[in-house]
């Protein structure tokens, strides 16, 4: 009887872990980090160990963990979206939709550049306001954040929009209407810093 119980217990030892959702290189890296689960009982997995391994990887947006009895684990990962590029102390990073900074490489050069200082999580909230507006985030080439809390954006046509610190959504929609109005097609600077006051400059 003891040998039967012991045999069943051994069958529940994890001997296979599958990681999907990222590049082969990143999947393999996470797989190596999860090596500590091999030969652990599938019923007694330390969830904090799993969370620590997965949450320290800034490229991960979310994940699902599935136990496949008797001895396998499957980790399905959703990669974070890369929103923009920023420079911190001379080092370039991507800003992810998960509110984290991700090591930069030379892919995704069409992302907007962020100048100034802003927390990654605050930047994600900023993009959500843009999504609510008529503006297309993909048409933005540069974003400037100032210590006052105000920001400017430049679109891919080179037009600079100086936004109000307050009523950001209203300012964005107003800028969109001006840009798409034939009368103002030559305006290169749209100054909306003061509420209910518009200054257009052709230069």
Language-model segments: what does each one mean?
Residues 1-203:
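Charged, solvent-exposed interaction patches on well-folded alpha/beta domains
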């Amino acid at each position: 009887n003891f040998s039967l119980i012991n045999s069943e217990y051994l069958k529940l030892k994890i001997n296979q872990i599958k990681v999907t959702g990222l590049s082969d290189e990143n999947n393999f890296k996470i797989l190596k980090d999860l090596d500590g689960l091999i030969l652990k009982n599938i019923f007694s997995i330390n969830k904090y160990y799993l969370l620590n391994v997965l949450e320290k990887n800034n490229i991960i947006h979310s994940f699902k963990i599935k136990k496949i009895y008797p001895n396998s684990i499957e980790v399905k990962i959703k990669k974070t979206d890369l929103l923009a590029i920023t420079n911190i102390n001379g080092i370039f990073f991507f800003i992810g939709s998960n509110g984290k900074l991700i090591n930069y490489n030379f892919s995704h050069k069409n992302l907007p550049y962020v100048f100034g200082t802003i927390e990654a999580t605050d930047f994600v909230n900023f993009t959500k306001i843009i999504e609510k507006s008529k503006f297309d985030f993909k048409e933005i080439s540069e974003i400037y954040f100032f210590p006052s809390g105000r920001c400017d954006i430049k679109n891919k046509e080179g037009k600079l929009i100086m936004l109000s610190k307050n009523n950001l959504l209203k300012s964005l929609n107003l800028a969109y209407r001006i840009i798409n109005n034939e009368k103002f097609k030559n305006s290169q600077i749209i100054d909306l810093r003061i509420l209910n006051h518009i200054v257009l400059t052709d230069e």
